[in-house]
């Protein structure tokens, strides 16, 4: 192990620390090496689920983000490296694989050898025992037709996309140094819904970015009400020392940030409840994660459908779980829906999904 660590340091880490003002910024860039082959990663997630990091660093340069300063430009793992890790974990019982990077849709383009996220997925779906593959952090800029096609047609790939949009106002997007316009974002979302009608779209939005006007915020609010995202996270802008956004004029007050955040989340709660109530009567497959006891001897299984990501989305609760255990996949019939969670009953006969 010690030899592997030393070898990894020698091969992969370059100290690029520098002085910024009166502070020393510690930045370590890693070459596109394959950490999995050097030291096999041990997931801290449940034994049936794992996160797979397909790249490190980021090349986007958003004005509010410090990641490129400390992690360097994006460096993708090779397809064989990722396939090797997924094969190993699937042989150990992992069934759900969540692919992550700072910008997953850009994956492979830095390698300049034809590698893309779609081509990686084509290899991952061939692996035995892989049940669900879910995609996170898909920036809209590089979300191309090849990627959409494989998401649509491959059964193992969850019909779920996480696209962190941050905002919809063009003036805010420009100050953020985002590469997409409101028009291109809306065009992509329309294409996703038209191509895959049952796709789940999750996004993350920011309120209170420097210079965000009341009109900008109202545009954002109108946007989410029109699109009706299946899942949405939001946060208030927080200045990161040393980033361009921290030096911008027209910083928004904390009070306004909080008010906008709560208004946005309240609107999304109504949208989520409406979306979930539309699922009543639908049959779906659920990954059981936990068995709950109400204290009176009544058990309930807590799990997730393929359209619910771990930790950030809601859950499905199944009454009378019988012999179900964490890690089991079970067919369930949705009987009720709330703002974030669903209630279902187990399907004991083979009705298909």
Tell me what each language-model feature is:
Residues 247-353:
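Terminal RNA-binding accessory module
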Residues 62, 82, 99, 135, ...:
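Conserved, mostly hydrophobic/aromatic
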């Amino acid at each position: 192990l010690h030899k592997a660590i030393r070898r990894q340091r020698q091969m992969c880490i370059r100290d690029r620390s520098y002085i910024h003002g009166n502070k020393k910024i510690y930045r370590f860039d890693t070459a596109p090496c394959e950490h999995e082959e050097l030291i096999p990663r041990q997931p801290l997630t449940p034994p049936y689920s794992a996160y797979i990091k397909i790249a490190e660093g980021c090349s986007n340069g958003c004005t509010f983000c410090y990641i490129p300063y400390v992690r360097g430009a994006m460096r993708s793992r090779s397809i064989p490296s990722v396939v090797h890790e997924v094969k190993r974990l699937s042989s150990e019982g992992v069934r759900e694989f969540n692919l992550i990077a700072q910008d997953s849709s850009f994956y492979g383009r830095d390698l300049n050898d034809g590698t893309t996220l779609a081509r990686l997925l084509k290899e991952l779906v061939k692996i035995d025992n892989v049940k669900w593959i879910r995609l996170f952090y898909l920036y809209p800029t590089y979300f191309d037709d090849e990627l959409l096609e494989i998401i649509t047609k491959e059964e193992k790939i969850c019909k779920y996309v996480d696209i962190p949009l941050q905002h919809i106002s063009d003036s805010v997007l420009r100050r953020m140094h985002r590469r997409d316009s409101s028009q291109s974002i809306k065009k992509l979302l329309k294409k996703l819904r038209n191509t895959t009608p049952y796709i789940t779209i999750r996004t993350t939005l920011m309120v209170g970015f420097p210079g965000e006007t009341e009109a900008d915020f109202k545009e954002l609010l109108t946007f989410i009400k029109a699109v009706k995202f299946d899942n949405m996270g939001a946060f208030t802008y927080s200045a990161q020392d040393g980033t361009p956004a921290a030096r911008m004029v027209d910083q928004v007050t904390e009070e306004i940030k909080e008010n906008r955040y709560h208004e946005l989340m309240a609107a999304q709660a109504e949208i989520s409840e409406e979306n979930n109530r539309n699922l009543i009567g639908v049959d779906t497959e659920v990954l059981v994660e936990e068995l709950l006891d109400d204290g009176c001897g009544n058990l309930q299984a807590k799990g997730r459908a393929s359209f619910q990501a771990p930790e950030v989305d809601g859950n499905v609760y199944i009454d009378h779980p019988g012999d179900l255990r964490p890690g089991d996949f079970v067919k369930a019939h949705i009987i009720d829906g709330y703002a974030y969670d669903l209630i279902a009953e187990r399907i004991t006969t083979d009705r298909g999904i």
